[in-house]
UniProtKB/Swiss-Prot annotation:
Signal peptide: 1-21
Record Pfam families: Adipokin_hormo (PF06377)
UniProt keyword annotation of Plastid present: no
GO molecular function, a single term: hormone activity
Protein name in the entry: Hypertrehalosaemic prohormone
């Protein structure tokens, strides 16, 4: 039994050395950044969205044409 206790203590000590965690949490941090309203300058313009839409349409058309020619 004495040997088992020593082994258990060594295993727990190794686990404690390998593990790190934050113990104290401050309640004064508030809600954090995620709840804030962001006025991001990164907004897609209508022109760029239309360009992407047309690009997807053209690629879909190419796929349909390839399927037509490959089925013949």
């Amino acid at each position: 039994m004495n040997h088992l206790v020593k082994v258990l203590i060594v295993v727990v000590a190794i686990a404690l050395v390998l593990c790190e965690a934050q113990v104290n949490f401050s309640p004064g941090w508030g809600t954090g950044k995620r709840s804030a309203v962001q006025d991001s300058p990164c907004k897609g313009s209508a022109e760029s969205l239309m360009y992407i839409y047309k690009l997807v349409q053209n690629e879909a058309q190419k796929i349909l044409e390839c399927e037509k020619f490959s089925s013949n």
